[in-house]
Amino acid sequence: MRGVRPGRWVVVTAALASVAVPVCTSGHPPTGHPGHAARYDTGHPSRYAGQRGGGQRGGGPAPFALPVGHGGRLAPEPGHARPAALEAPTAGLLSNTTGAEGVAPALAADARYVQGSHVLRLASGRWMYLPDGKTASAVVVAGHPPARRQIERSRAWLASGRVPGTSTERRAAAERALLAMRALLRPNGAVAAGWSDGWKYSWPRDSSFVSAAFAHTGHDAEAYRILGYSAATQRADGTWEARTKLDGSGPPDARSAQLDANGWVPWATWQWYQEAPPATRRARLATLYPMIRKAADHAAASLRADGLPPASPDYWELTTATANIGTAAPLLAGLNAAADLAREANRPQDADRWTRAARRLSAGISTRFLPLGYQRTVDGRHGRDSAVAFMAPPFNEAPSGLAGALDTTYRELLLPNGGLTPGNDPGARWGAYAWTPSTAFFALAWAGTGRPEKAGRVLDWVLSKRNALGELSEKVDGKGRPSSVAPLAWTGSIAVLALVALEGTGLPTPPLGP
């Protein structure tokens, strides 16, 4: 573990239901906690390491920890005491589209958003909002004209695109998810994973999903802005850092790069291109094409003799000893996407090169992963992985054996609370907490493989776990309560994509090359 020296953990107890966040200040993570050490800037190489334990049991106060000196920006309503030494992950957001401020769980419990906005109606009836051009919230009388104008602009933005959903409940969830993603999007195109301090970084993976969700709901400018940020932060060798600071100045720590970004970013670009205005999309693709070429060439060059990529940290941000499906599947999607974009850009040599690489990778996946039911790794030692869903549309055309693998994986990862653990690797103890992104993957996969009823049931479970403000949280605890940071951009984007996929013609998938 880079930059981490033996030491001690600082853990305090807060009366915050369902929150467990161990954070390493200078040592190894303790066992038994499912919190978010990796998302804090502690030098730990894994996004999820230290999060895999059983969590708090028995309904008592949850252990909650922050790095020494860690400050927050959560704004309490007047009359609500703010914890002096620690803050909980956010439960919501105030936003003026250029700035954001987190809403504390204690405040969120008695407040509600004014519909279609990030203006908060407090228990007192007054409004709390983030004034334009400001970084601190204000509490004003209901109907305050500047706050009202902000509400009107927010609703106009929603109306400029579309809000997917076949029911009132689904549309309400989609609306809130879209607003949350807009609030987490920075003017430079960076997407904060969440708005608690440890989540205020931009992950290429999360950002790619958000870009695709914006593209498929008619918000072209936002989708393209995210892709522009990806182009600006791409490394010289064609890869990306695991995460960057929101100002684009670089990574906050020395964790290893993750090769899956070389699949996710071309895939997101391809999804944007399908929905972009035809009159301008080729010219705008030309601006992004150097990014695509570097990403796809690096991905193709990384493939070994067996057609698979090398071992790399997967979406768990944990390194495996052998190739994993969480890297191989996104790279296949990205190579197919890049090849199709090359054909659109009249670059036939690029298209042929990346198509050949995609065929090699597809053959390697069929040879090594298919016999194992698309388990996490090719050595068969690390169990089932929710990343099996990345082999399904809208990422890849469903290969042989995938339907059974999806069913088996879902069944083996299902928790008593109705959600999924990310995987059942014997070396990764996730405990009783379900992860909403991992669960929502299956809604998207089943929607894309012609099983809308199964997709709908899973999606409705995820949407039913929104918190009091209607935000989607990162986790759901063993008692079925939303837990950890909310809103989470990644979960929101997957939910929106699944809702789109369940409507009309569904979502497109990058084609296999000719």
Question: For the regions a protein language model found, what residue spans apply to each?
Answer:
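The feature captures the catalytic groove of carbohydrate-active enzymes
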Residues: Y113-V139, A192-Y201, R243-W264, Q271, ...
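Structural helix-adjacent loops and short alpha-helical linkers that scaffold large soluble proteins
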Residues: R162-R171, A215-L227, W272-R293, A339-R359, ...
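Extended ligand-binding clefts on enzyme/binding-domain cores
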Residues: S256-L259, T322-A333, E344-A345, A351-A440, ...
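Low-complexity, Ser/Thr/Pro/Gly-enriched N-terminal "stalk/linker" regions
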Residues: L16, V23-H33, Y40-H44, Y48-K200, ...
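C-terminal capping/lid segments that line or modulate ligand- or cofactor-binding pockets
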Residues: R255-W272, G380-S400, S438-P514
